Amino acid sequence: MTSHAANPKEEQDQRLPFKSDISGPIAPSQAPAHTVQAHDSQPKPSDDSSDEHLSFYEAKARIVRAFAASRAPQPAAPAAKALEGDASVIVPGKLILSSCEVEESSELLTKLGVTHILQVGEELKPSHPGRFTYLSLPILDMEGQDIVALLPSCFQFLQQAQASGGVCLVHCLAGISRSASVVIAYLMWTQGMPYTEARAMVRRARSKVYPNTGFTLQLQELDRLRESGAIQWGDTPSLASSLEQHRQPWNLIRYLEVKEKQAQEEGWTWGRTLVI
């Protein structure tokens, strides 16, 4: 997706009856030293075999999960030279954003000096588990998914990479929504940037960046809480604690429901303004 204009599909999704329940933050489980695998606390589609009982959210989640499960590893990654343009340098010598194809090319990873790889996607698995340090976090590219809950783990991993003098590659499937949202949030946290400035910086390096509507709203709300002082950035443990203390309805539908209720109670108009 390369357009920066509002996406009609996403606008339509906001009007449809999603159904979503979000649990607490995802905590990494015990895993081999080279790979940290997190538990999936995102909402699961119903096991009800009758499609007529599925909400829109459940039906969409079922399709997305089926696609994720069916994605087989590529028999051979494209040539490193052909992929160089897909490796977007966000912070020189520290942070790179890309699609999954860059991660599949050990030749290009070595050329880029990559030492750590942050995978943001349920369908993604390490291609070179013995050669690079991985953190793999399961999340779907859906508006109702809670990406804020992943941020403390992501930030800690990125800090560890930089403290060791390494270069971290952050990627999802296409390097457009999930991984881009994490990188934008990381710049907000480390550089003290507002959301719009961090997003603009990432887009200058990678013009195709386009977080889905739910992730955008979550990051905007996170920025608002940061500016108000409700959330203290601090170190990652402080951030995780602060996020838990000021728990928000991070997913899109609960966010809209809460804001509309607040508008009704306080007598102001909630226009669902979204900067994209």
UniProtKB/Swiss-Prot annotation:
Bias (Basic and acidic residues) ranges: 7-18, 41-52
InterPro entries found in the cross-reference section: Dual-sp_phosphatase_cat-dom, Prot-tyrosine_phosphatase-like, Tyr_Pase_AS, Tyr_Pase_dom, TYR_PHOSPHATASE_DUAL_dom
Location of the active site: 172 (phosphocysteine intermediate)
Xref: PROSITE patterns: TYR_PHOSPHATASE_1, TYR_PHOSPHATASE_2, TYR_PHOSPHATASE_DUAL
CDD domains for this protein: DSP
Induction: By oxidative stress.
Region described as Disordered: spans on this chain: 1-52
Pfam families, sorted: DSPc
GO MF: JUN kinase phosphatase activity; protein serine/threonine phosphatase activity; protein tyrosine phosphatase activity
Keyword Hydrolase attributed: yes
Substrates-to-products reaction catalysed: O-phospho-L-tyrosyl-[protein] + H2O = L-tyrosyl-[protein] + phosphate; O-phospho-L-seryl-[protein] + H2O = L-seryl-[protein] + phosphate; O-phospho-L-threonyl-[protein] + H2O = L-threonyl-[protein] + phosphate
Region (Catalytic): 89-276
Enzyme Commission (EC) number: 3.1.3.16, 3.1.3.48
Keywords, ordered alphabetically: Hydrolase, Protein phosphatase, Stress response
UniProt-listed SMART domains: DSPc (SM00195)
Domain Tyrosine-protein phosphatase as annotated: residue spans: 86-228
GO cellular component: cytoplasm
Function of the protein: Could be involved in tyrosine phosphatase signalling pathways, having MAP-kinases as substrates.
Family from the record: Belongs to the protein-tyrosine phosphatase family. Non-receptor class dual specificity subfamily.
Protein name as annotated: Dual specificity protein phosphatase
Annotated source species: Chlamydomonas moewusii
